[in-house]
């Protein structure tokens, strides 16, 4: 995620800046491609010579987002296609079909006509589970800017993932009734219930997802809305921790998304 926010996206914004010489921009494009793409490509291809099913969503998604962002910056259709194909059909937890480990009715009845989607890392800890919200948000938004609506993919499954995650993390209390499908991880064994480790983790990303689904698509997203409002104004994450890797500032960027 940092590669997109710290290198690819700023470079994309500055590509027409008259103070950045064309030859220097071309050097930068070659540098970001040569430096970061091979690592991400190798990881998604063979997961550093380990089993794809022993990985995590939060490992695959940053590599996918990096490749997609480099593809956009360099007008490289092959890389864009590679990242999107992994989202659709990849062999790893970044594949949307692999990311979802259970579909559940909302015990509280607030999510109507839809399901809560249990993500792969909900049984691991909430630091990583909430990290995936932002990763999905930025990946989908990058594709959306190119006219590819991943937010809507598979009947808006990304929203269902976010609603499950938001519902559990709205408070630090542990008395939240959460349906859970047991999930077996080849290295760590069975996950029998939602992990309370890091519960209530406040990472950026909620403003983008909530405002897109609620304002652009006109959909009901009660738990994502509550989480976005709880954290508003969305800043730059918790400085000094891993959250500082998120771009953040979602309230500033996306609160008026309906007008964009």
Which functions belong to the PLM regions below?
Residues 1-5, 258-260:
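Conserved small/polar residues in nucleotide/adenosyl-binding loops
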Residues 4-146:
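Aromatic-lined, polymer-binding surfaces characteristic
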Residues 150-257:
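CBM-like carbohydrate-recognition segments
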